[in-house]
Amino acid sequence: MGQAVEYTDLGATVHRDGLLDGAAAELDGLYESLMSTADWFATRESVMPDGACLLDRPRHVLPFTIDGDTVEVLNRTFAIAPADAERACEALFRAVPQARRIHFDAMFPPGRLRLPTRRLETTDHMVVDLPAGTEAYRASLGKSTRQNLRLYENRLRRGYPDVHTEVMIPGDRGRELVDRFVSWKVDRFKELGRTTYWELEPDMAERFTELLRRCGEAHVTSAGGAEAAISFVFHVGGSAFALETAFAPAFEHCRLGFLAQYWVVCDAAERGAACVHLTWGTPTYKGRLGATPRPATMLSVFRHQGSRLWSLDEAACAAKARHPRAAERYEAARRAARRTAASAKRRAVSLMARR
């Protein structure tokens, strides 16, 4: 629409003409988050922003799309104070009259947002906060983790004395490396009876290759004269994002996937990164590498309480998504109650026998 509206009381300006180049250039420095970069929006998410909400004091750049009555703020895994999120939502509701809800990814407790909301999904982003240097990072790990890492590395080097890792800008090899990575990932998931999102989204490999070409690097481990593991890493400001890792099935006994991620973190520490994002999922082994969870909750933010009635289908989907976890908790509680009852019965029988 080629228009911008300024709301001085909110310290906000809403542009309805896409993401301007100047605003896009600010994203990396503002958030140091791969998931809040123009490259991520264009490739991994495959969306073009319809506009951007710009805040002052403090500065924020929040690209968004509009789909009917829904505004989607595209930023992910980024820091914003609840009060600033409120300012942005108020400005967007004013600028987009037909909007009844705004989808917003919050890394603060959702209850601190003083607007009507619905919680859709919560994920834990696993992040390693790095001390200064590789040795300090290694020393920060638990004793058993350090012992296991030495065990796995020694096992790998005994079997493959030539093992080494090269950090490269993929260039023309990008698609080749992505295809090899995907083949390893698919083979491993098949053994587990699972399907990868690479199979569910056939164009994912092409989009990921473009993201890699724009801003990524490949950590390629070779052993026995062949490539054995690949990690794709993206540096944004002082943050490193270890987005994907896969390895050849023959190296399972060496725990090469675990080692590859450990080496990525060590490399980031050596290069002076402040933190490494190991993204979401598999929190147990990522925790062994020093990662701690940072919850992110996808919210529907409403203009007013009555707007909820226009999205009851969304409420049903959110409830359904939560249902399996509720069922699991119920079953766990039921089993615990059964064990308690059985234990009480055994004690009662024992007491009766003594009388």
Regions found by a protein language model. Name each.
Residues 2-69, 107-125, 135, 139-252:
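A conserved beta-strand-loop-helix scaffold within acyl/acetyltransferase catalytic domains
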Residues 3-13, 112-136, 140, 271-340, ...:
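Active-site/acyl-donor-binding loops of N-acyltransferases
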Residues 75-82:
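The substrate-binding groove and active-site-proximal loops of carbohydrate-active enzymes
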Residues 84-132:
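Non-catalytic accessory segments adjacent to catalytic cores
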